[in-house]
Amino acid sequence: MKFTKSLLLLIVAVFASSNAAETFSNFQVTNSDANSPCVTTPVELKVNTCQSACGSILNVLPVTGSTSKFTFNQFGAQDTKCAATPTSSNEFTCVDGKSKVAIGSTTYSVVCVPDKTNSSESDSSDSTRIGASFALFALALLSMLAL
């Protein structure tokens, strides 16, 4: 019985801390090729969501066996600003939430853009959520030790 309660409290703490992760509303792709229509206007993929910087990007496939390399899907109808898009065989490597890699003769830069569109949250809400998650985790740990 004590083990079940401890396990339940630990699951609650882990769930609370996972909800505190920063979310991203979109990511931008810029292109260094002077002949590309992307060079003056960044490709803004608003339909995509970065779950974490270089962690998991919707419509971008992770390379097997790597947590930092991703392959682009065809942007297709999602992309209205740029006709010249990379194919699914092209890769980029993330470093600290930003990435630049030469694909052929073109360098693509990928940057995750934090989601600040929720009007009920202020800029300080991230630190508040992290603090609350830490407090929940500490409470769960103390409860487990008391059992």
From Swiss-Prot:
Stated family: Belongs to the ponticulin family.
Q: List the disulfide bonds.
A: none
Q: Has keyword Cell membrane?
A: yes
Write out the GPI-like-anchor amidated asparagine lipidation residues: 118
Q: Which residues are glycosylated?
A: 118
Residue ranges listed under propeptide: 119-147
The way it spans or sits in the membrane comes to: Lipid-anchor; GPI-anchor
Keyword Ubl conjugation listed? The answer is no
Q: Name one GO molecular function term.
A: actin filament binding
Name this polypeptide is given: Ponticulin-like protein C3
Q: Where is the signal peptide?
A: 1-20
Its taxonomic path starts at:
Eukaryota, Amoebozoa, Evosea, Eumycetozoa, Dictyostelia
Task: Look up the record and report any one GO term of the cellular component aspect.
Answer: plasma membrane
Q: Which gene encodes it?
A: ponC3
Keywords in alphabetical order, please: Cell membrane, Glycoprotein, GPI-anchor, Lipoprotein, Membrane, Signal
